[in-house]
Amino acid sequence: MPKRKKQNQPQPPQHLALSERDEPGDEEDERPMGPPSLLGPPPMANGKPGDPKSVFHRGPPGSRGPMIPPLLSLPPPPRGRGHIRGGLGPRSSPYGRGWWGVNTEPPFPGPGHGGPSREIFYQEPRNPRRLKSWSLVKNTYPPKDSPPMMEDKSDRPVCRHFSKKGHCRYEDHCAFYHPGVNGPPL
């Protein structure tokens, strides 16, 4: 395979230039070397730097596939904590004033952070009226021991499927009238 041979060729002596220097960032004609940028290399598409088509496809060297642009990857807004007093801005410390306002606790409390567990955090509130109505509906059905009683649906329109084919795939759960099954025959 010719592609494997190209990959195994020795790299150009790019690393030697770094080792010849005393420290990175000594030379004044180059940009001072600091911590690596989170944005990766400058955008390139088809070998052209700065091409607008390549903005969404940049990533760290060696990575493949699209990367989310940094402006679209902000942390999610906190839920259930009221409005943010500190506003959007850089965080001074992980739990201090900044993204989460005056709160001194992490934004998503969990078992590792000493707060309540996430299960409670994401649990939706219960509706007592809904629970009460379900208990009433549950008690209106006859017990399983007694023979089932069919609901009279003769006041409803006749089921088209039952009238054409003689059966309906919804059977007892159909909302329409099945003559002779859930009411008097026609």
From Swiss-Prot:
Residue ranges, compositional bias (Pro residues): 33-44, 67-79
GO molecular function, a single term: zinc ion binding
Region (Disordered) residue spans: 1-97
Gene3D superfamilies in the cross-refs: Zinc finger, CCCH-type
Zinc in keyword set: yes
Zinc finger (C3H1-type) stretch: 153-181
Zinc as UniProt keyword: yes
InterPro entries given in the database record: PRR3, Znf_CCCH, Znf_CCCH_sf
Residues passing through the membrane, by range: none
Keywords linked to the UniProt accession: Metal-binding, Zinc, Zinc-finger
Protein name: Proline-rich protein 3
Annotated organism of origin: Rattus norvegicus (Rat)
Record lineage: Eukaryota, Metazoa, Chordata, Craniata, Vertebrata
